[in-house]
Amino acid sequence: MKNLFLFCRAGYEKECAAEIQQRAAELNVGGFVKANNNDAYVVYQCFEEDGGDTLVKQLPLDSLIFARQMFAASELLADLPESDRVSPIVAALSEVSKAGELRVETPDTNEAKELSAFCRKFTVPLRQHLKKSGSLLAQENPKRPIIHVCFIGPGRAYVGYSFSNNSSPYFMGIPRLKMAADAPSRSSLKLDEAFAQFVPKEEQEVRVRSGMNAVDLGACPGGWTYQLVRRGMMVSAVDNGPMNEKLMETGQVKHFREDGFRFEPQRKNIYWLVCDMVEKPARVAELIEAWAINGWFKEAIFNLKLPMKSRYKEVMAILNTMQEILKENGINEFQLQCKHLYHDRDEVTVHLWIRPSQAWN
């Protein structure tokens, strides 16, 4: 297929477009971007007929900051007849064979979500016809490709596929997390989503486990500390402001009424460092770099608040500088990931894992 369809947050189409333009060029897949403000999606139109196939295979979704989900896509199917929308879609998917799942989706906008009820109903007959054509297996198979049909408006859809090992497990790339009734703030969901994004399920018992020591810089009132406590960690919560009383009653939290930028940990066996401070992103990055150079943590999750303009450029500059500084200070083995999470707004979440090949005692 010729195109790559990418879901993103409404208002971040320019950032998603700039990123896919750069990343596709790195893979020598030429093309141009189609994007409109607040559509919540971007289409990268490749010059080569199989450009979308190449990108969906070679470009890891997890390496993209602003895309929630992506799939190799056909040209836009416009003016689908009300009397038979199924046949043109089945025909457009003729080159897809034995897919394991069907997702009929919309972009994440209020206008597009008005089609949600239609999409749910339409899935049933479409699934039956795709099974008859051989594009879809009779039984769901999580190891096979996923068929995507994304309605961007009434009678208008992009169709295509993604690979299950390079795709979000969620419809539209949106995780459905529930806000706990006793969580101190909604920001709690950001760290919950970040753990799911950056730490594979099969590794969470080792890397996100009870008994670990953690530090939360800028902790007040305790939204991120809550997620650490919920996972059984012992937390040093650093903030001049007050902490949630119920969190303090757990006995797992020690509150340091200090400036997060000046705090130095008493413990030297800290595994997790987390930080969600409203501060210039470069300053937060410098703080994390200092902690890494001092060897004060193994893994960190932190948020970078985004400027109003040149957001992709700013994030990339900070991440590139961080990589250079770590290497200059003898930290040559690390994993650095960044994602504009669903629960993020004008910010991105970054994960830094120092020397992942070395065990933590």
UniProtKB/Swiss-Prot annotation:
InterPro entries tied to this protein: RlmM_FDX (IPR040739), RlmM_THUMP-like (IPR048646), RNA_MeTrfase_FtsJ_dom (IPR002877), rRNA_MeTrfase_M (IPR011224), SAM-dependent_MTases_sf (IPR029063)
Entry EC no(s): 2.1.1.186
Subcellular location: Cytoplasm
GO biological process: methylation; rRNA processing
Alphabetized UniProt keyword annotations: Cytoplasm, Methyltransferase, rRNA processing, S-adenosyl-L-methionine, Transferase
The keyword Amino-acid biosynthesis belongs to this UniProt entry's keyword annotation: no
Active-site residues per Swiss-Prot or TrEMBL entry: 305 (proton acceptor)
Keyword Protein biosynthesis appears in the UniProt entry: no
GO molecular function: S-adenosylmethionine-dependent methyltransferase activity
Family matches, as SUPFAM superfamilies: S-adenosyl-L-methionine-dependent methyltransferases
Family matches, as Pfam families: FtsJ, RlmM_FDX, RLMM_N
Membrane-crossing residue ranges in chain numbering: none
Catalyzed reactions per annotation: cytidine(2498) in 23S rRNA + S-adenosyl-L-methionine = 2'-O-methylcytidine(2498) in 23S rRNA + S-adenosyl-L-homocysteine + H(+)
Enzyme category, top tier: transferase
Binding site for S-adenosyl-L-methionine: 187, 220-223, 239, 259, 276
Complex and partners: Monomer.
The protein's role, per its UniProt record: Catalyzes the 2'-O-methylation at nucleotide C2498 in 23S rRNA.
Family the entry assigns: Belongs to the class I-like SAM-binding methyltransferase superfamily. RNA methyltransferase RlmE family. RlmM subfamily.
NCBIfam families, A to Z: PRK11760.1 (NF008734)
Protein name per Swiss-Prot or TrEMBL: Ribosomal RNA large subunit methyltransferase M
Organism: Shewanella sp. (strain ANA-3)
